[in-house]
Amino acid sequence: MLVAGNWKMYKGPAETAEFCLGLREQELDGIDVVVCPSFVSLAVAVQLLAGTEIAVAAQNVHWEEEGAYTGEISAGMLSEIGVYGAIVGHSERRQYFGETDETVGKRVHAALEAGLFVIACVGETEEERDRGETEAVLRRQIAVLEPDDNLVLAYEPVWAIGTGKTATPQMARDAHDLIKSQLDVPVLYGGSVKPENAAELLAMSNVDGALVGGASLELESFTAICRAAIHS
């Protein structure tokens, strides 16, 4: 069972340090825990979580080893500072920064080749679900990926991210079944996971953990979700 906290564009180095010091004190044995700070806070998190079982991952990674790609960071650069992995293809990257299935596939491949652990995100928009296109969208997004021991997928129904909406257990179960039928890797749920719904979501047999957004920003709520995973 894996619980990953995606901090998005929150928490600079000082707030990251405070959070990581608090997280170190928590008893979270029995699950894998990953925090995903912004680029400027990665080194602080790596330093303060060294010697624990808590891993640090980035929120994005480029497919080239180096080059004239202003604003990007390579897998090798992340590895050099001790970063364990990266999120790739989050819906906000697709929506605001023009990520496509093709570029997501390239980023995932490069990160895996460099030895990073990857959380690759897939999921449909509300419009796509309303049109009955969920299965087609998921199949298309998964088609650029291949099984790997260092790859997990996160199903994030886009309409549930940051909206307070959550897929019903049946919706999540159906989506996870489809994903697992296409790619034999663990699948996390990632749509407005919070302490109030974590136990129900994580109790489903085909849910292998959670990619947590807003609820990962507060130590109390993040650790509550982690404990729900421990007891699931």
What are the language-model segments listed below?
Residues 1-232:
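Active-site loop-to-helix "anion-binding N-cap" substructures in soluble metabolic enzymes
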